[in-house]
Amino acid sequence: MTCPSPCPLGQQATEPDANFFSLTRRPRILRIFNVPKCFHGEGVPFVRMAFWKSGAGLAALVLMAPILPQILAPTFARAQQWSGIIDPSRAADWSKAGVRGGIPSRTMVCATLNPGATTSQINSAIASCPNGQVVFLNAGTYSGLSGIMFNGKGGVTLRGAGADKTFLVFTSGVGCHSLASDVCITAADTNWRGGPSNSANWASGYALGTTNISLSSVTNLKVGSPLILDQLDDPSDTGTVFVCQDPATVPSCSLEGNTTNGQRPNRDQVQIVQVVSCGTVSTAGQACNGTNVTITPGLYMANWSSTKSPGAWWATLPISGSGIEDLSLDHTASTGSFGIEIQNAIDCWVKGVRGIDSGKAHVELQESARISVMDSYFYLTQNAVTQSYGVESLNSSDNLIQNNIIQFIAAPLMMNGSCSGCVIAYNFVTNDFFTASTGYVQASTNQHTAGIDMLLYEGNIAPQFYADNFHGTHNLVTVFRNQFIGNDGACYNGAPPYGESACNNNQVAMDIRAYSRFYNLIANVLGQGGTSTGYQSGSAPIYKIGGGNSANGVTVPADSVVAPTLMRWGNYDVVTAAVRWCGNSSNPGWATTCGSTSEVPTGLSKYANAVPATTSLPASFYLSAKPAWWPSGKAWPPIGPDVTGGNIAGVGGHAYTTPAQDCYLNVMSGAANGTGSVLTFNASRCYSSASVTLPLPPT
């Protein structure tokens, strides 16, 4: 709707939004309405408001303005799902991950295009589409495309009729600033590690959780903009959290260094926040008029320091509120390009997409925050050795990679740079096709570079978890209620191009290498009967802990700090054939299952974790309830020590298949071992409409 100016006082609210009506399950929320938003001349069609009873009567809270950056909802101080299990110094508020308020369900179509439409026509439709509307591509094949571009164009959805109906076939990519990509969602200016559009010294405000900082300059910074915070790497190892990428460090912390990924050189610790207010202004889009800046979320890490030259940098014209939905992207003829590149963005998304044979990553997220990649299917890359990624995140924060199917890709879930506060959840990974070595089980979830911290992996089913030491150190990663099998359905057998047979090498469930410290491994189901041979020793162990590596004349030695800083609690593995609650003598199985050996790091001088007082665990560390897209008859949670009667064989009944795995096996008719050609996919045939989970109203 178009609001009159000025907006009439007390303009009538519309009926409750069906997509958010399920939120009224919360007992204190009465109704949720779409209310026309007419203030500040922002041109936003509506906001969503929740009403609840308070001591003073009826109160209201703005929940969601689906077009502009979502900065109106306050941050609630509330207990985290992990409270009482993980020490607060070792975890983050992961409920903030993904598009703030959820991906908007846009219904207004600004342009409808038909098969035969050219790249130029699609790009023109995007460029001219009003804020909050949809460019719709009818069913059919759109051939010969050479790069779809959102050049700073926010608030637009490019939507097809379904990934099994609308087919986009690319012959080349488009220059996405410094990269080639078949679809480019990026800021209007070039802001990157080698040439920031704007930069400043970060003068004060470094404490864990702080939301108030000061900068030396705020040129071109606006309320609602993403702000990239960083600092110098650690010059030496003090035996605690260590941020390092330089192979010349003694001893070496990295095999290859990290000078070509998203962070500024030697400034690998990064958090991207959003400006809430600055100086005296707090209206979205207004230019900052003072150097005191309020941010959201607060700082996740406790090691920010004035001694490490902390700094900030930002785009002048970042993009927000744009997304790609419900179509198929065929990259086979577009050699060497990324599939979808998202840069200098906030609150953008990829949903219901099928990607085929990308030149590099199917989706790369760079200098971006609160990006959602969900309900999609990614198949094959052109190079099955290096840069063969499903979803790649670097120099990002608070991204949500959720409920995707990833098949026949060497590195499906690649953290190739900082991703503080990111959530990787409920993805199904099969057949990590890798041609560098025969019979080799390739890792599914890589932490690959320096600066990775405060990640959450939850509910994933995949062959292997891997924290490597190729490009630097990682800290404070949480792994909750996943199944890591320690094997894959099939591995490359040396017969080009796609020959496969049974795997026989690197059959490890979790490989956590040197300088991957302060990890939390909780309630996971690990290993495969008949394959896994040892708990943390032998040829096919459940765990490899703290190991070094050598390559190109560089040796990263084993790290004796990894094991004593590691928290393991409530995990089931097929070698132990029991759940391990190994904290202290009061825990079940202490003398028998645990051998009277604690796996909870209680005695550390920093980042210590007390033994949890209970073996009870929440269903999720980022969701407050079963999500709406989860089938009503499906076990929730699907994986963990408290799960019984699961339908995945050989793991003591502690694991059920997830919706993504069910979609792959039962709807798409995928092979159990992950082999075969690309499959037909439509997210709507597998998943219910998603709704958001919002904080409780204040009491």
What spans do the regions from the language model cover?
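Extracellular "leader-to-stem" segments immediately downstream of a signal peptide or signal-anchor
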Residues: 3, 20-25, 31, 38-39, ...
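Cationic, low-complexity basic patches in intrinsically disordered or flexible, solvent-exposed regions
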Residues: 12, 16, 38
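Ligand-binding pocket scaffold of soluble enzyme catalytic domains
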Residues: 130-133, 155, 159, 269, ...
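Predominantly extracellular beta-rich ligand-binding scaffolds that present long acidic/polar faces
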Residues: 157, 469-588
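Short, solvent-exposed linear motifs at loop/edge-of-secondary-structure regions
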Residues: 218-233, 266, 272, 318-330, ...
